[in-house]
Amino acid sequence: MRDLILFLSLLHTIFASLFSLKPPSQDDFYKAPAGFKAAKPGDILKTRKSPNKPSSLYAPVDVQNSWQLLVRSEDSFGNPNAFVTTIIQPKNADPSKVVSYQNWEDASNINCSPSYGSQLGAPLSTILTQLDMTFIVPPLKSGYYVVLPDYEGPKSTFGVGRQSGKATLDSIKAVLKTKDFSGINDDAKVVLWGYSGGSFASGWAAVLQPEYAPELKDNLIGAALGGFAANLTGIAESVDGEVFSGFIPLALNGIANEYPDFKKRLYEEVKPGAKADLQKGAENCLAASLISYPMYQYFTGPRRVFEKGWSLLEDKTIGKTLEDNLLIALSKEHMPQIPIFVYHGTIDKIIPIKDSIKIYKNWCDWGIGSFEFSEDKSNGHTTETVVGAPAALTWIDARFAGKPAVEGCSFTTRASNFLYPNISESAASYFKGIYQTILRSKLGSGVTSDDVSVNGLRSLYHT
């Protein structure tokens, strides 16, 4: 593992020196032009070739082309805004197939945006975006265009459902208008895919589509959701005081970026000595927060950040704001109209599987057309990221091939999602290689703990 870390650090140093990048906070391309409010959601405000090639683990990804669009959208309250989305064209591009891949950005700082962290020359602060980029290589090799929306928008609203869902949908609307330079057909089929924080944005896009983007009805053909983040408060309960407690300040500040009243109440309730640490959540990207705040107690224990503990969620402003951003709390009217595939590890200690199962039961009881759930008995959150990916790709391939999705609901428990039917040999080999390289283990050797990536990241930052 140390050899890998040293190698990645060397790659980063080399490419960072060769390919300079302006962070979004200093890049005028990210700023909406005068009069942009008159445009419609999904309209393209600006277009450019991506400043640098896309990269995965700080090595260039071999693609035909890459563009960035500034897209008109709106926030949770319908106020106009604009965000950047990235289109990646593979060498053997099929103009009829697009994967909208929602990265696990999980941060409340615009300089953590996927459009920035996915390129050569990106800083070490975005290393988890570079890791996440390994998952788009197989779809690109299959000839699928890949789209990476900065779905958190210009305010970096991590944990805000409607902003994330609307931006994801407006990104697709915009991409389908780019045939003149990207080659993508305006009637192309699109599949949503995301893991963890990416599943949050993808899930919200799926539930909002019938009302917010009915024009995409014939384009969207499914959503693959891994480590499905259906309940933010359930995640907070799971990670508070544990290895991945660094998620909490990122989400709280992301929500605060969208809801001023929530922010005011939140910071009124912070213990004076803990305010600076909470504010760091508005500055850090995901990796830095995870390695800086493991085992941190926000709602439990004698040294908790909030004196009121979990009773803080009973506050009218805080409680209602959080509930408004829970997929699991939505009514029948927000049930997806597209096929859904969820893959989730039984022993996930970050996003408890029980909430994914609850939303499965809700949507099935309400008569969803197609929902396939694949539970992995052997893996937690970090390892299922890799182990479940070939299953997701197999499901996505089937949608693009025009094969029928399951009718109604299907729940299957497997020893491992590597055993999902019809996984291609190339996909299995690719992801087994990632598993063994990144997680420093062979499959089946018992590496299922959700602390492996934190240890690796800490080693990287202290190399």
UniProtKB/Swiss-Prot annotation:
It catalyses: a triacylglycerol + H2O = a diacylglycerol + a fatty acid + H(+). The keyword Phosphoprotein does not apply. Glycans are attached at residues 231, 422. Keywords: Disulfide bond, Glycoprotein, Hydrolase, Lipid degradation, Lipid metabolism, Secreted, Signal, Virulence. GO terms for cellular component: extracellular region. Disulfide bonds join 112-285, 364-409. It is an enzyme of class 3 (hydrolase). One of its GO terms (biological process) is lipid catabolic process. Its main location: secreted. Induction: Expression is induced in medium containing Tween 40 as the sole source of carbon. Expression is up-regulated during the yeast-to-hyphal transition. Induced during adherence to polystyrene. Expressed during experimental infection of mice. Expressed in host cecum and infected mucosal tissues (stomach, hard palate, esophagus and tongue). GO terms for molecular function: lipase activity; triacylglycerol lipase activity. Transmembrane segments: none annotated. The active site is at residues 196, 348, 381. Residues 1-16 form the signal peptide. It is found in: Secreted. Its EC number is 3.1.1.3. Secreted lipase that is able to hydrolyze both the neutral triacylglycerols and the monopalmitate ester Tween 40, allowing the use of hydrolyzed products as carbon sources. Has broad lipolytic activity, which may be important for colonization and subsequent infection, therefore contributing to the persistence and virulence in human tissue. Belongs to the AB hydrolase superfamily. Lipase family. Class Lip subfamily. This is Lipase 6. It comes from Candida albicans (strain SC5314 / ATCC MYA-2876). The lineage of its organism: Eukaryota, Fungi, Dikarya, Ascomycota, Saccharomycotina.
